[in-house]
Curated annotation (Swiss-Prot):
One GO cellular component, as annotated: ribonuclease H2 complex
Catalytic activity: Endonucleolytic cleavage to 5'-phosphomonoester
A Pfam family assignment: RNase_HII
Assigned EC number: 3.1.26.4
Chief place of localization: cytoplasm
Gene: rnhB
InterPro entries per record: RNase_HII (IPR022898), RNase_HII/HIII (IPR001352), RNase_HII/HIII_dom (IPR024567), RNaseH-like_sf (IPR012337), RNaseH_sf (IPR036397)
Lineage: Bacteria, Bacillati, Bacillota, Bacilli, Lactobacillales
Protein name stated in the entry: Ribonuclease HII
Organism encoding this protein: Streptococcus pyogenes serotype M4 (strain MGAS10750)
Family indicated by similarity: Belongs to the RNase HII family.
């Protein structure tokens, strides 16, 4: 067994089980640095085990479908139903069988600082990705519920021509009129890894669009609020009026459109 604290730390990094004999051997080492390293590694392993358990639970829908013979399960989710401005964006993602991506979760539960990293991990591992975007004008024409469906259908259509085609759809709280077997899952982005993958792809895609709109239409805080009705956004509406990306069927934009004193 290594004796220097530096060597012990290096040995601990290779340990992946809480039952490893090295932990028991080091428990009798009275040096503060050793005990600190020991507890740190044990905590890290516990964190990894908890993450593995969480990911395994989020594969329950997929594993049940694999047992039934389905091979290419697509997760589908959308982002942007509630904002006053910008599009609704949906993504359709097919991950390899039993694929686990550390940190992947409902995009609302992932710290913003980690969005890009997990998004890139999904892009690297996914067998196929489709993205559907429905702009504010069509949202106003058909309503946000129907626009969400259209975005999801467009995301599925974007898979055409890719090597992997879906034989089953797991959809976040929605049923689609399409000839592919499917299941609607309430809070699917928190209960299915495939849907969670679609959630982060849709989220990052839309956030990038809104950051670009923030440069085109400054004063509304689009890069920070993604078009939601924050205080800064509402103040921008009062100060500068409605932009071409605002949803005129959503309040308070709708009332501003009816007010002849506003553009």
């Amino acid at each position: 067994m290594p004796t220097s604290i530096k060597a012990i730390k290096e040995s601990l990094e290779a340990v992946t089980s809480l039952l490893d004999p090295l932990f028991q051997e080091l428990a009798t080492d009275a040096r503060l640095g050793v005990q600190k390293a020991l507890k740190s590694r044990q905590k890290a392993i516990q964190t990894d085990l908890a993450e593995e358990e969480r990911l395994e639970a989020m594969l329950s829908y997929e594993k049940a479908l694999y047992k039934k013979g389905y091979q290419a399960i697509a997760g589908i989710d959308e982002v942007g139903r509630g904002p006053l401005a910008g599009p609704v964006v949906a993504a359709c993602v097919i991950l390899p069988k039993y694929c686990k991506i550390k940190g992947l979760n409902d995009s609302k539960k992932i710290p913003k600082a980690k969005h890009e990293t997990i998004y890139q991990a999904v892009k690297e591992k996914a067998l196929a990705i489709g993205i559907g975007i429905i702009d504010n004008q069509l949202i106003d024409e058909v309503n946000i519920y129907e626009a969400t469906k259209l975005a999801m259908l467009e995301a599925i259509k974007q898979l055409e021509g890719q090597l992997t085609q879906p034989d089953y759809l797991l959809i976040d709280a929605m049923t689609l009129d399409i000839a592919i077997s499917q299941q609607s899952i309430i809070k699917g982005d928190a209960n299915s890894l495939s849907i969670a993958a679609a959630s982060i792809v849709a989220k990052v895609t839309r956030d990038q669009m809104m950051a670009n709109y923030d440069r085109i239409f400054p004063g509304y805080g689009f890069a920070k609020n993604a078009g939601y009705g924050t205080k800064e956004h509402l103040q921008g509406l009062k100060a500068y009026g409605i932009t071409p990306i605002h949803r005129k069927s959503f309040e308070p934009v709708k009332s501003m459109c009816c007010d002849s004193t506003n553009p």
